[in-house]
């Protein structure tokens, strides 16, 4: 590991443009605008997880009471969403490398909101569950993957190489405490 640390330090000294921290008398610090972006991103991550986990936690109750589903049938819907996410992780990473992480996350948040709204409206119009809703669950998985695949790299790219563990810890603190 000391060899890797040395290589990382050499890289950072040759490429200061990749390092968002500034050296001050107190040590390396993030500029105010980067701290603001990091704070906004971490709060957003928490809210994404609170919202998604809130929906998925109460989904089986909703499916049973509104759609008359059994627990197994409700779990099928959530499994389809998870499958949609798993199938989307690698393609979403590729898309984000072309259009950017921020745009991909925005797409994901809009698709997630739109999918939930469409599922709600279809439930009203169709007066219950329809297999057409399975398509929306696939889209929910795609949307959730669009958000998740890109949020950790956005947090980590705000630090220098020696702080990746610290910033990864920040990400997981905000995402897991929201669950």
Question: Which residue stretches match the model-derived regions?
Answer:
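Intracellular juxtamembrane helix-capping segments at the cytosolic ends
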Residues: 146-160
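Helix-to-loop junctions at the C-terminal end of transmembrane segments
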Residues: 88-101
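Juxtamembrane intracellular "pre-TM" segments in multi-pass secondary transporters
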Residues: 2-43
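Loop-to-transmembrane helix entry/capping segments in MFS-fold secondary transporters
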Residues: 71-72, 159-171
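Short amphipathic helix-loop junctions that connect adjacent transmembrane helices
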Residues: 57-74
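Cytoplasmic membrane-interface "Motif A"-like loop-to-helix N-cap segments
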Residues: 98-111
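Hydrophobic core of transmembrane alpha-helices in multi-pass small-molecule transporters
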Residues: 130-146
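C-terminal ends and interior cores of transmembrane alpha-helices
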Residues: 111-128
């Amino acid at each position: 590991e000391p060899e890797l640390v040395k290589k990382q330090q050499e890289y950072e000294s040759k490429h200061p443009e990749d390092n968002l921290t500034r050296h001050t008398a107190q040590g390396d610090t993030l500029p105010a605008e980067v701290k603001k972006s990091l704070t906004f991103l971490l709060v957003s991550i928490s809210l994404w997880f609170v919202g998604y986990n809130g929906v998925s936690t109460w989904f089986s109750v909703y499916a049973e009471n509104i759609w008359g589903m059994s627990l197994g049938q409700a779990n099928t819907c959530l499994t389809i969403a998870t499958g949609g996410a798993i199938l989307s992780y690698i393609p979403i990473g590729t898309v984000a490398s072309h259009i950017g992480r921020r745009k991909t996350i925005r797409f994901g948040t809009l698709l997630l909101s739109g999918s939930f709204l469409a599922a709600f409206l279809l439930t009203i119009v169709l007066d219950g569950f329809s297999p057409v809703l399975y398509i929306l669950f696939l889209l929910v998985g795609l949307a959730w993957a669009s958000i998740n695949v890109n949020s950790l790299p956005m947090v980590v790219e705000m630090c220098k190489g020696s702080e990746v563990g610290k910033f990864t810890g920040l990400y997981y603190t905000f995402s897991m405490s929201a669950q």
